[in-house]
Amino acid sequence: MLRIAVPNKGSLSGPAAEMLHEAGYQQRRESKELRIVDPENEVEFFYLRPRDIAIYVSSGRLDIGLTGRDLLIDSGANAEEILPLGFARSTFRFAGKPGTAKGIEDLAGLTVATSYEGIVAKHLADSGIDASVVHLDGAVETAIELGVAEVIADVVETGTSLRNAGLEVFGEPIMKSEAVVIRRVGAGTDEAAESKVQQFLRRLQGVLVARTYVMMDYDCRAEHLEKAVALTPGLESPTISPLHNEGWVAVRAMVPAKEAQRIMDDLYALGARAILTTAIHACRL
């Protein structure tokens, strides 16, 4: 049975559970549940603190886990990213009072407060900057106001918390993060377990594709087909079928959801009709 770690709270928890549900896996009904078994899919889910997941996975006790890229790197655990999931995107930045610094070179001799000591210390060392790092668990924005540090380093999603604290980001981003699937470095030697892991990854990849694309169908005159296909090439090739009316064909292809309205406009201008899109709920490519 595959053993998988899932975030039990925070910004990763809800979207992770939603993605797993879309992939056909049972999820907990009560937030207090720490473990559930999905017997039909032969998977056991463990709901853990997001910051601890990389440690559990690297120990080999759990096969794979869903966590943040920033948390994986900060942990220093013997685990690696195997699939980005496209949600909980954020940027890790330095911030301070206006005028404190313009770039990382201005941090020499200063103190940086952060909840991600591993990431920050390595970034400073790699940049040749001699600065002190103070570890705080959450709400690092107050560190400057209380005189604990001159600068903070934190995850920035909207920047609202920083602005409310009178702080501004500066310099280049330290890193960009998102939710990822991780596993222990060197895992994958057991063929039976590897088969289950790959099936799990295919399901999640199917969800990602289903969220990104829609299926588009339309009717088109045969003489305009090449131009129409150029607008809707599909992932490999569109499906084309002759219609009862001579000189007309039906076309079906997957198109990026974000571009669907523009493509429909272009097809209509080309003379295509009966243009419609259908949501994709699951797929395997």
Curated annotation (Swiss-Prot):
Relay the activity regulation note: Feedback inhibited by histidine.
Q: Which cofactor does it need?
A: Mg(2+)
User: Which GO MF terms are attached to this record?
Assistant: ATP binding; ATP phosphoribosyltransferase activity; magnesium ion binding
Pathways involved: Amino-acid biosynthesis; L-histidine biosynthesis; L-histidine from 5-phospho-alpha-D-ribose 1-diphosphate: step 1/9
Q: Which GO terms describe its cellular component?
A: cytoplasm
The top EC class is transferase
Reaction(s) the record says it catalyses: 1-(5-phospho-beta-D-ribosyl)-ATP + diphosphate = 5-phospho-alpha-D-ribose 1-diphosphate + ATP
Subcellular location(s): the record lists: Cytoplasm
Q: Name any Gene Ontology BP term.
A: L-histidine biosynthetic process
Q: Which SUPFAM superfamilies does this chain map to?
A: GlnB-like, Periplasmic binding protein-like II
Domain of life where this protein originates? Bacteria
Q: Which UniProt keywords apply?
A: Amino-acid biosynthesis, ATP-binding, Cytoplasm, Glycosyltransferase, Histidine biosynthesis, Magnesium, Metal-binding, Nucleotide-binding, Transferase
Please state the Enzyme Commission number of this protein.
Answer: 2.4.2.17
Query: InterPro entries this protein is in?
Result: ATP-PRT_HisG_long, ATP_PRibTrfase_cat, ATP_PRibTrfase_HisG, HisG_C, N-reg_PII-like_a/b, N-reg_PII/ATP_PRibTrfase_C
Major localization class: cytoplasm
Looking up Pfam families in the UniProt record yields: HisG, HisG_C
Q: What does this protein do?
A: Catalyzes the condensation of ATP and 5-phosphoribose 1-diphosphate to form N'-(5'-phosphoribosyl)-ATP (PR-ATP). Has a crucial role in the pathway because the rate of histidine biosynthesis seems to be controlled primarily by regulation of HisG enzymatic activity.
Q: Which family does it belong to?
A: Belongs to the ATP phosphoribosyltransferase family. Long subfamily.
Mind telling me what this protein is named?
ATP phosphoribosyltransferase
Organism listed in the record: Streptomyces avermitilis (strain ATCC 31267 / DSM 46492 / JCM 5070 / NBRC 14893 / NCIMB 12804 / NRRL 8165 / MA-4680)
